[in-house]
Amino acid sequence: MCGIICYTGKKKVIPILMDGLKRLEYRGYDSAGLAVVENGKTFMVKSKGKVSSLEAKLSDLSSEATFGIAHTRWATHGKPSEINAHPQFGCNNKVSVVHNGIIENYLEIKEELIEKGHEFTSDTDTEVIAHLIEQNFNGDLETAVLKSIEKLDGAFGIAAIHSDVDHKIVVVKRGSPIIIGIGENEYFAASDSTALAPYTNQMIYLSDDEMAVLNSTDYYIKNLSNEILKKKVEFVDSDMYTNDKKGFEHFMLKEIFEQPETIENAFRGRIIESEGVSKLGGLEPVIDRLKNMKKLIIISCGTSYYSGLIGRYIFEELTELNVETEVASEFRYRKLKLDKNVAVLAISQSGETADTLAALKEAKRKGALLLGIVNGVGTSIPQLTDAGVYNHAGPEIGVASTKIYTSQLVILTLIALLIGRYQGMSFTEGKEIINAIKKLPDQIREILSNAKMIKEIALKYSVYNDFLYIGRLFNFPTAMEGALKLKEISYIHAEGYAAGEMKHGPISLIDENFPTVAIATDDLVLEKILSNMEEIKARDGKILAITNEGEKKVKNIADDIIAVPRTLPLLQPILNVIPLQLFAYYIADEKGCDIDKPRNLAKSVTVE
């Protein structure tokens, strides 16, 4: 949700912190701030709004400070305001804290501190941490932080500095990501490796209940029992974390156009064409358990939930597994029977989604096999799961997911193919699926070559305030994902429905001012969705159809069509969603919306 960046070393700190905030802004952008220490005095600057607002306030500030902390916020406790922005500080302005997460018992701690004479200025839970550290400080920041977090309930990533303790930064992780960057006589901490990539390729991913202590000459990591730990240093490909639009107007448009490459990255080195099977090294440690599993539960949130819904159809088509897909935030509260014969597959772009992590921990307690599909290497979900597969799609900066979604669908297909071949799928069927997967990048390029035509259609429909999206089978979740994209970035009301459910309510809304986007590609339910389209036309509803080239019946009913290439029905959603992404993008652009940073949303949802 929020973004944290910290630095201690010999370079001027403010340019480094500001660069880091810009790279982290997609995690939250309703306020921002920084605190630096120079000559034993803390200088703090905060601003409501985006990082550019903070940058404007810093334009006249001249500072030689070489250590500090900074934060970009997505509000959970307290409205977006300068007072509620981080860093937060104690009564004497010596302790400064940035925090990502939620402190569940902050009100009772706040009452205790008020009784001891502390005065609070903000509505945030974070300010409680600063006052608590101040209360416990006796010359040793490290000890004060350790003593303070003993009282905290909830999930958090915390960074703290004290103006009396030169060049020392103390960071703690519990349920919210903290990554340490190792430079030459300089050290960094951040909530995302994207912020560190320009400065170092050596990173350490903290696990829960670990603390890192950084200064300008060295660092060490310990657990909360005060024991020093030896952590593996990961060497990260910094090129994977480039934060460049590459000539596109928005990151989202760039990421839409990157999908031929990210699809290739998803299957490159992971298929054995001569055997009609996939090869997923990340699953090899558990393959004997996996191929004998009877039940698979897919858990995820948002766009990843819709990829999971399509994944259910794919697994049912290719394997003998009994498959369920659950919203992660609901999963942990249900009385589901979980044991060693059940696999739970978590899908998350960031690898840090709080609800998904909480659901995984519940499944782990009950003995299930834990699997993951994530894009964020070294993040919390891969650390928690027994095995998994990375997207290797590079950073997705636009808040509305595009390239990760289609990459997830390819990986789900590869996992289902792997299990299916163990369970009786023929070589011929496996080879057919592999051949179809290999064609996807060029088929996506073909769709993208028609972006100008899709833009013209989008502009035509940009005058409407409500949309219905309908689909069946594999394309029911595609309809929901298409509607979500439009809602997220254009703020237009849109609903995705199973087409067969239309007559059970949504059809009452249809008139000439309520258009429908119908996903009507060639599969066994095409005739059914054609009937639904006829019902819409009978009520003067306008229809934009996503269909295959040459589908005359669709063309005869729809007002407008966007044609996509044919592929296997289980892969067709990958192609069908591309024009839906572009359609949403061009409408939002026409409306002048902030496409990469839509209001009230954050890229990485690290609070429940």
Where are these regions (language model features)?
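Glycine-rich oxoanion-binding loops at beta->alpha junctions
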Residues: 66, 70-83, 273-287, 311-347, ...
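Generic C-terminus detector
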Residues: 252, 542, 555-557, 567-608
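Active-site phosphate/pyrophosphate-binding segments
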Residues: 259-263, 267-297, 387-515, 588-608
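Conserved short alpha-helical segments that host acidic/polar catalytic motifs at enzyme active sites
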Residues: 1-249, 264-294, 333, 445-450, ...
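Glycine-rich phosphate-binding loops that contact phosphosugars or nucleotide phosphates
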Residues: 291-439, 519-560, 583, 591
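Acidic/histidine-rich
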Residues: 152-186, 462-488, 523, 530
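Structural motif
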Residues: 67, 95, 295-297, 343, ...
